[in-house]
Amino acid sequence: MPSVFEATAGAAIGVGSDQTGSVTQATNKGTAVTLNKVAGVVTMNGAALAAAAEVSFTVTNSECTASDVVIVNHASAGTAGSYLVQANTIAAGSFKITVSNVSGGSLSEAIVLNYQIIKAG
């Protein structure tokens, strides 16, 4: 299998543009999304997330295997520092993202998340 990573002198290491994509969550913050790319951008739904609450949603992704590592972060939009974001329940064909509101109030923001699948082996 050819590598999905590319390295160019003077540039950051990452995946090629053909291995990235984006998706916008519909309906609510718990709605599953599908994005079959090694790296991607998920724009969450702008529904309210109460203070100290968390929500999880499934990312269906044919590139993901149970032994992969998934990294996710709050990339933009919304109140910086008000969310904790993690990937979990990594399986063949999917993973979950959990977003926690660590602010003191309810937030209704369509935050943007970046994820990257690090292939095992």
List where the protein language model places each region.
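Terminal beta-strand-rich extracellular "head" domains
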Residues: 68-76
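Glycan-recognition/cleft segments
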Residues: 82-90
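Extracellular receptor-binding modules and their adjoining Ser/Thr/Gly/Asp/Asn-rich linkers
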Residues: 1-66, 89-121
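Extended, low-complexity, turn-rich repeat/linker tracts enriched in Gly/Pro/Ser/Thr and Asp/Glu
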Residues: 76-81, 103-106
